[in-house]
Amino acid sequence: MKFVFTLACLLAVRCFADDPVAAWSKDVRIKPVSSVEGRHSIHTYYVTNPESPDGKHVLFFTSTHPAGYVGEVRILERATGKETVLAENVHTEDAHRAACQQWLSGGKRVAFHEVIDKKWRVVVVDVATLEKKIVAEDHQVGFGRPDVDLLPMYGCHWNPGPFRDLEVWDSKTGQTTTRAKIAEVEAKYGEWLAKEFAGKPCSVFFPVISPDLKRVFFKIAAGNGGDDFMAKNASHRQGLVCYDFEKSACIWQHGKWGHPGWTPDSQHIFEMGNVIFDIHTGKYTKLKDVPVLRGSHPSVSPDGKLMVTDGLTEPVGGRPNDWGIQVADMHGGKWAVLHHFEQNRGARSWRRNDPHPVFSADGKRIYYNTSDSQFTRLMVAERP
């Protein structure tokens, strides 16, 4: 009997190894991260994991404001549900990415940005002491890696002033350095910039550092000036540029922004449409036999075997306007939809909140937002 049980376990392990989607195909537990009701709870974006590097806490933004514009940056202890407020009265650009809150320094710190009287600043909080440090003004924050000390920043996309380059703050040294200049982008891709942005001054926007810390990708913005950031036409934002820190050079450019994200090997970018770009050659491939969901924000599991995305679910049998969370094999062919839900309620932000799903570091959980009721809620799906 013991032999039969052991054999069954080995076969199950082999099945999951051959088919990484299998573990997500049944008995997946889905629940809100927090049991507290009567407020929005929002994970920021699909390029950053809200779970702390040690897996003990979850980071999110909460708000009772109808549109989610003002609230608190909090962490929740997964084992007990206890919440700690890291920052309060935080004013945001929208409920789409909230405060861009993210882990830093192996979980010792949390970074976010906020606006006070129309002046933006980047803030870092020491999780143990709750001490806050303003590391930059007239800047917003991009996305670094939770296990290291580097935090990318950029000038406000609608009116960057003199801050048009990519800057990186190092929590170890407390120093900020310029790591990529918009002038380098202009020198290499000037013809594209002139065509896309009609000759308007441009700046680096929304940088995301690669897992190996050797590269960064970013979008380009041409601001319309002023201080009205709550508007779609505050700036024109488009394109994708990949920059190599070691070479101090732009190495790749794509004319459209398609919700890109790094793959774990730092050699590829995966984006909506199930497209995988090789950053060295610019060539791309698509996942075979995996339905494409419209409006998706895809991200890849830490082991590189799976992708998760959100999107409208009609291509997979969903009702019109229903959204869902889809997991798929990065080799193509196998996929599963974990959750169908409405996404037309929640925070009444001028830029709507999207689910923005992302895996935990161990690949066993997926975090995402839903807006199927009065409040936007951060959910977690956990496989057996």
Briefly describe each language-model feature range.
Residues 18-384:
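Sequence signature of WD/YWTD-type beta-propeller architectures
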Residues 1-7:
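Sec-dependent signal peptide recognition
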Residues 8-17:
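Hydrophobic h-region of N-terminal signal peptides that target proteins for export
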